[in-house]
Amino acid sequence: MAAQDYVVKDIALAAYGRKEIDIAETEMPGLMACREEFSFSQPLRGARISGSLHITIQTAVLIETLKAIGADVRWSSSNIFSTQDHAAAAIAATGTAVFGVKGETLEEYWAYIDAIFQWPDGNPSNLILDDGADATNYILTGSRAEVNKDILSYPKTKEEEFFFKQIQKRMKITPGFFTRQRTAIKGVSEETTTGVLRLYQLQKEGLLPFPAINVNDSVTKSKFDNKYGCKESLVDGIRRGTDVMIAGKTAIVCGYGNVGKGSAASLSGAGARVKITEIDPICALQAAMDGYEVVTLDDAASSADIIITTTGNKDVVRLDHMRQVKDMCILGNIGHFDNEIQVSALRNLPWTNIKPQVDIVTFPDGKRIILLSEGRLLNLGNATGHPSFVMSASFTNQVLAQIELFTRAEHYKNEVTVLPKRLDEKVARLHLDRLGVKLSVLSEEQAVYIGVTPQGPYKPNHYRY
């Protein structure tokens, strides 16, 4: 690594970060098993991974696992507020190029994404590990701009303005960079619902030039990280941000997918009276039969003490909704991007910063709302994200996906796919001992009776867990 090929808040935080990484390793059996299984064969030897995913203690364990099995890695955060500065310092201190500071600007955010593709030897990355598809979008938009730079002329948002400026800057410094980089990519593995939606859209438009593995829809990711992770980290973020009593409050959760289910359970477990909004009749029926009142935000916003978005969509909480809420209503997002809440519509109102990632926005009539993490992920902005154990399952899927793409890319088409069921079951199996779980074993006769092998896979691909 070149001299100081990193950007962190304070490299002196490395020792603190290392202590927490050591603890996290004891809670991440899947990643530690990957190190043990693949340390000799080194399946990622020669892999040059550009990673864009929240720089946390748990991500540090992922990065060090990728390196332990042969990969070279450069890393940036996928959110301006999610970096844990001591984790970033600990990663940088080991010689990994890492770029992230909690509270970085949008300009810095896109500069850091650019940096994960700038290797000291000048050669390109051959894999992307993404969270929200920003790194993928950077390369693909840049390669299209090298053909037609007019696509960068009219940014629609402030973030897009910085995004386009960074592409223009790189095009000027390194002509042809994006096309060369796009051609070198074997594939991308994507962590989140939002990123997967972007990849499917690229596939639909014929703009996906390499294979993409949808890690998000591995059962051991979506049914665990999205649900059980949010169940623990949502209330943690609200409490750290506000110190407000949740019991007895009325909370509205927008969306009842896996993230919404975990969020509703988190709030109801803390004693809140939870209401759900939904567009999908199946999810709405699930919410109703789980005991929640299913409402529309138009009707129910005025009753809310807390509103949480979980949808991955845009304009879920609009300005007209925010005008209806109670004074000092807490407003936050645990979906992905900050456009679930119309934060841009609040920018011309008075903001009072209470502490990092906690602001009070005041309306002309004197009503105030407490906005967490400026509408970005509150569980990472106001707290430290999901616990290590559940992230071990998600990140073990990422490791296996990167191995698949690097060693078997020719078996994948330029489309979005999920990991095979056998690997999903493997990830689950790696986490059972830590919880003291003992599996029953099918006899040969039982296995034949239900049409499987005693070793699995035990469910068809269409099975819904």
From Swiss-Prot:
Note describing how the cofactor binds: Binds 1 NAD(+) per subunit.
CDD domains, alphabetized: SAHH (cd00401)
Claim: NAD is one of the keywords in the record: yes
Cofactor: NAD(+)
Catalytic activity line of the entry: S-adenosyl-L-homocysteine + H2O = L-homocysteine + adenosine
Keywords, in A-Z order: Cytoplasm, Hydrolase, NAD, One-carbon metabolism
SMART domains cross-referenced by the UniProt entry: AdoHcyase, AdoHcyase_NAD
Record EC number: 3.13.2.1
A biological-process GO annotation: one-carbon metabolic process
NCBIfam families, A to Z: ahcY, PRK05476.2-3
Cross-referenced PANTHER family: ADENOSYLHOMOCYSTEINASE
Known function: May play a key role in the regulation of the intracellular concentration of adenosylhomocysteine.
Protein name (record): Adenosylhomocysteinase
Gene name in the database record: ahcY
